[in-house]
Amino acid sequence: MSTPTGSRRIFSGVQPTSDSLHLGNALGAVAQWVGLQDDHDAFFCVVDLHAITIPQDPEALRRRTLITAAQYLALGIDPGRATIFVQSQVPAHTQLAWVLGCFTGFGQASRMTQFKDKSARQGSEATTVGLFTYPVLQAADVLAYDTELVPVGEDQRQHLELARDVAQRFNSRFPGTLVVPDVLIPKMTAKIYDLQDPTSKMSKSAGTDAGLINLLDDPALSAKKIRSAVTDSERDIRYDPDVKPGVSNLLNIQSAVTGTDIDVLVDGYAGHGYGDLKKDTAEAVVEFVNPIQARVDELTADPAELEAVLAAGAQRAHDVASKTVQRVYDRLGFLL
């Protein structure tokens, strides 16, 4: 694998909690990764350890881990330019997480918004210690690789702040041990919203699947969802996310998958109605997902190539992260 000279290291990952990424993942996080891999030392991970904070069927988890990695490759992540691996195959993540947990205040961990929200929904009996310590494992994910930059959305910014705090706390006792990562604000990518609730981000946590465009769904189903997308009672097609969120979301989607500027799209719809917009957007999405689905099918039908990519990625990840763990263990006084 070639790494650009003088490039800064980045780390990011996605949980394998479903059989398909959705369009928001593809045009948001993964599109950012594709753009970053050329001029960064990039580590992209399938974070399966994080997935087990809720019960998982073992066979489903194995399948979803492989299919998530396959979608990384199909969307343009290049193992010749980035390290792609599965979290559980690199022991350094859990080794470092225990140490960092011993440098994380209970009060700070208790204030993590995602934990408070999820534990409130699940109730105390159903809430696991794993969910509570989830941000500490995230910190280990990042700090194990001497990561300099982390591309994060607003929902993960608090967790990155915890990682920074823990690294600084460790360094205050053992100077120069851990690299303190910075937030990376990538170039603007498309923000894709739920088709049925276009004021909310497209997300697997939505109450219904009707607003999601899953990359690996039957294209006919995706087209049907787009034709049923919420719009408004007006007739004119213009880009105005505040007043016309549904129409603006469809324009965003079509623009993102075709590379056509939104203003050009709007001009082309002069005198046309929402039916035309939905039809064209559906056709554009189907054209976008078809080659992705074909590549995923190819990789999963004969997984030798995919498994080789993940094995090579895990080895490189281990080579890097184990040095961090060894450095941390040495500073703490552990026998090596």
Swiss-Prot record:
Residue positions binding ATP: Q15, P16, T17, G24, N25, G153, E154, D155, I192, K201, M202, S203, K204, S205
EC class (word): ligase
Short motif ('HIGH' region): ranges: 16-25
Chain residues that bind L-tryptophan: D141
Gene Ontology CC annotations of this record: cytosol; plasma membrane
Catalytic activity: tRNA(Trp) + L-tryptophan + ATP = L-tryptophyl-tRNA(Trp) + AMP + diphosphate + H(+)
Gene Ontology terms, MF aspect: ATP binding; tryptophan-tRNA ligase activity
Coarse class of the protein's main subcellular location: cytoplasm
EC number annotated for this UniProt entry: 6.1.1.2
Entry annotated with the keyword Oxidoreductase: no
Protein's cellular compartments: Cytoplasm
The organism's place on the tree of life at top rank: Bacteria
Residues spanned by motif 'KMSKS' region: 201-205
Example of a GO biological process term: tryptophanyl-tRNA aminoacylation
Entry keyword Ligase: yes
Record keywords, A-Z: Aminoacyl-tRNA synthetase, ATP-binding, Cytoplasm, Ligase, Nucleotide-binding, Protein biosynthesis
Record NCBIfam families: trpS
PANTHER family, sorted: TRYPTOPHAN--TRNA LIGASE, MITOCHONDRIAL (PTHR43766:SF1)
Described function: Catalyzes the attachment of tryptophan to tRNA(Trp).
Family from the record: Belongs to the class-I aminoacyl-tRNA synthetase family.
Quaternary structure (record): Homodimer.
Name recorded for this polypeptide: Tryptophan--tRNA ligase
Annotated source species: Mycobacterium tuberculosis (strain ATCC 25618 / H37Rv)
Lineage, highest ranks first: Bacteria, Bacillati, Actinomycetota, Actinomycetes, Mycobacteriales
Gene name of the encoded protein: trpS
